[in-house]
């Protein structure tokens, strides 16, 4: 009998999941496992511990996946041991004497290095490794260009995909076989109470992801006004709020795309329904940017050579992250982040610009703080957007400074948002 270790990373679902599909189609025994991430000691800005809301959302999503396995008579092993991801995964593979390791490949540099190290360990022991792309709408071999020729800016990328490619089809959930290794259901310990002001009052997990999608598309049809409302900052429905579920893979981009197309076919299509797909394409672009550029995504100079260096002043950074800069819009957004683990896209652009262009700090500290605090943190999107604001990304216009007073006047003219978080 052939046995594989099925490693879950940021693909915490059973449906439309290539590693899951492959494992249960090709191996007699499957051991599903999730390894709680360790802090990255090589991070250029050091380590900020995860915020309590991120801890809670991740824990809820992992527990929800475990419950799905229990329904099928299986167990999800949740490993919280000390050591690196590579050490812990290889130790499990050795302990259970598996024939293969099956998992999702990640686009960011550190995760790519993990995969290479696991490949090396496995090759020395005649263990197969199989990696599948799970973050993207499109399969790499079906992109209308080689990765090395990825367009330098978003618009030509989007136009080529829309002209020459189609997102991959959604995969069915395979028939699961009972796990050869049984364990008691994992119970999360992280729990953060919900702030009633939160624009993201949702739990993590597959069921919560589909509940949100059904609400936003089918129950309320809010998708039909998405383009007009997406720059809001208060309330749950000004935007889709799919990002946290996408970041952890509680739902896939392909599943969301399929539901958008079904909605357009059965209900209506307009500029707003297209715009939600447009935003999925922005996310897609950052995934491939991360895979192409690797470690450069995390360097101060980003994708551009010889950019001037920024300083790091601890006092100014603390004012920024604590929401005490004296700029009402910036402070309100940073306090929302601390209280909920979420911030609107409009808010993220403003606080990022303020850190880089007003406080003149190294953008990587802001990106690292977002990484620690955001429940929807995705390395490719987070660091890609920070590079963009800092002027060291693919599209290197040097000065993307947001006038926060003008932004507040335009997007919060009555001061409702600022008053909500500063009162």
Predicted features along the sequence, with ranges:
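Intrinsically disordered, low-complexity boundary segments flanking structured domains
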Residues: 20-22, 62-65, 117-118, 139-143, ...
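Glycine/tryptophan-enriched, flexible segments
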Residues: 127, 148-300, 408-423
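Short coil/turn segments at secondary-structure junctions
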Residues: 45-49, 197, 317
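Hydrophobic residues within well-ordered, non-membrane alpha-helices that form the packing/core
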Residues: 69, 122, 158, 217, ...
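Active-site-proximal binding-pocket segments
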Residues: 235-422
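Trp/Phe/Arg-rich N-terminal binding region typifying the photolyase-homology
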Residues: 1-169, 335-336, 381, 385
């Amino acid at each position: 009998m052939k046995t594989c270790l099925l490693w879950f990373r940021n693909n915490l679902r059973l449906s439309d999941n290539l590693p899951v599909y492959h494992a249960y189609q090709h191996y007699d025994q499957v051991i599903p496992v999730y390894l709680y991430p360790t802090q990255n000691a090589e991070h250029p800005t050091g380590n900020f511990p995860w915020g309590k809301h991120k801890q809670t959302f991740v824990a809820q999503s992992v527990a929800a996946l475990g419950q799905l396995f229990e329904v099928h008579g299986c167990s999800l092993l949740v490993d919280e041991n000390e050591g690196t991801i590579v050490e812990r995964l290889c130790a499990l593979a050795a302990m259970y004497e598996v024939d293969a390791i099956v998992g999702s490949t990640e686009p960011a540099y550190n995760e790519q290095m993990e995969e290479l190290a696991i490949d090396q360990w496995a090759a020395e022991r005649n263990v197969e490794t199989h990696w599948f792309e799970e973050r993207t709408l499109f399969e790499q071999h079906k992109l209308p260009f080689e990765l090395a020729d990825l367009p330098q800016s978003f618009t030509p990328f989007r136009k080529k995909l829309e002209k020459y490619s189609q997102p991959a089809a959604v995969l069915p959930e395979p028939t699961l076989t009972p796990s050869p290794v049984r364990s008691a259901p994992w119970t999360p310990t992280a729990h953060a109470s919900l702030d009633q002001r939160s624009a993201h009052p949702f739990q993590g997990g597959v069921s919560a992801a589909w509940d949100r999608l059904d609400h936003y598309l089918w129950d309320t049809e809010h998708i039909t006004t998405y383009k007009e409302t997406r720059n809001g900052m208060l309330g749950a429905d000004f935007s889709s709020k799919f990002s946290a579920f996408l970041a952890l893979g509680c739902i896939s981009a392909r599943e969301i795309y399929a539901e958008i197309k079904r909605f357009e076919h059965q209900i209506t299509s307009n500029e707003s329904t297209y715009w939600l797909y447009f935003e999925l394409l922005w996310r897609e672009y950052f995934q491939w940017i991360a895979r192409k550029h690797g470690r450069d995504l995390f360097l101060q100079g980003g994708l551009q050579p010889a950019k001037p260096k920024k300083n790091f002043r601890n006092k100014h950074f603390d004012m920024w992250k604590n929401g005490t800069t004296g700029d009402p819009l910036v402070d309100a957004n940073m306090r929302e982040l601390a209280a909920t683990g979420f911030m609107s896209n409009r808010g993220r652009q403003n606080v990022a610009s303020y850190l880089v262009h007003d406080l003149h700090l190294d953008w990587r500290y802001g990106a690292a703080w977002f990484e620690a605090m955001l429940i929807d943190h995705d390395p490719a999107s987070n660091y890609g957007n920070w590079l963009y604001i800092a002027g060291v990304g693919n599209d290197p216009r040097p000065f993307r400074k947001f006038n926060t007073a003008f932004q507040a006047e335009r997007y919060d003219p009555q001061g409702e948002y600022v008053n909500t978080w500063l009162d």
